[in-house]
Amino acid sequence: MSDLLFTLHCAVRDTEALLGAIRTVFPAPIHIRAQSVRSQDYGDAGTAEKVSGELKRTTLELIVGADRMPNLLQAVKEARRDLPVRWRTTPLLDHGRIA
């Protein structure tokens, strides 16, 4: 089965809940990045974010086999989070580690 780069964008306050949910079904390393997003889409923004036009978000990335995606998405769906998440997968042609 091919490997995918799974990328998930979430509200900062939902980060820990999503990490816990993902860990229950997939033990791979998860890369966590804080992001600031300039946007006009304020559907899930806090008051300070609406005033500044800058959304604070967290990006989670991990490499997952395509066959594991249904379980991973189900865990994200069932996570105890407050706000919606955005996700995408990108096919990986090759990857590895160089020591």
Q: How should each PLM-predicted stretch be described?
A:
Residues 1-99:
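Positively charged, small/polar-rich N-terminal and surface patches that mediate targeting and assembly
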